[in-house]
Amino acid sequence: VSYLLHYAVFNDNVNIAILANKASTARDLLGRLQLAYENLPKWMQQGVLVWNKGSLELENGSKILAASTSASAVRGGSYNVIFLDEFAFIPNHIADQFFASVYPTISSGQKTKVIVVSTPRGMNHFYRMWHDAERGKNEYIPTEVHWSEVPGRDSVWKEQTIANTSEQQFRVEFECEFLGSVDTLISSAKLKSLVYDEPIKRNAGLDIYFEPIKNHDYVLTVDV
């Protein structure tokens, strides 16, 4: 929120979109930004043209929109910063539709920034984005905030939190574990040891990860 506010105040005529899995969550984030704005020194504040639960417009021409993440959320607009909150909780098909709709707008601006923030929720589209970012396969920069970096949180706090919730919930919400956030037949530890790789070839829906080796025996398992 602080970065978005700084960007809007110190840059003229910029458009910022705050999108979340629910419209109420996006409006809550905008509300925090508005509260931060009210606490800025008077010399730093711009004149306000629009101030409501869904949008903010400053005298320097900068605008901030709050809405739910959908394919039509920012269609037709031009944005300098798009902030996506709790992106892992967006259904896969909506996330795919969103980027298919918005990416032309994102790629048209040389300085357009996309900030994706989320708690892990299993091995879904957000996991794929994060894993690819770690391996340098996309242009995102992975940044993890561990619970121990928050002032006042220590081992005692950890033990109390686990006692009041569960170890699995703690791993997901605070340890940023992608596995364990969904119930699986196979243990999380085993799944975590597996590696996600891109296929070496794709052909009409057939993904090939390894070339067959001559005179080797292979076993095929099919889940129907």
Predicted stretch roles:
Residues 1-12:
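Walker A/P-loop NTP-binding motif
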Residues 86:
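Catalytic glutamate of the conserved HExxH
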Residues 27-80:
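Inter-Walker segment of RecA-like/P-loop motor cores
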Residues 13-35:
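Conserved Walker A/P-loop ATP-binding site and its immediately adjacent core
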Residues 8, 15-17, 218-222:
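Conserved beta-strand elements of the Class I
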Residues 97, 147-222:
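ATPase catalytic-site recognition across NTP-hydrolyzing enzymes
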Residues 35-39, 43-45, 89-165:
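ASCE P-loop NTPase helicase motor core
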Residues 82-83, 221:
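Walker B beta-strand of ABC/ABC-like P-loop ATPase nucleotide-binding domains
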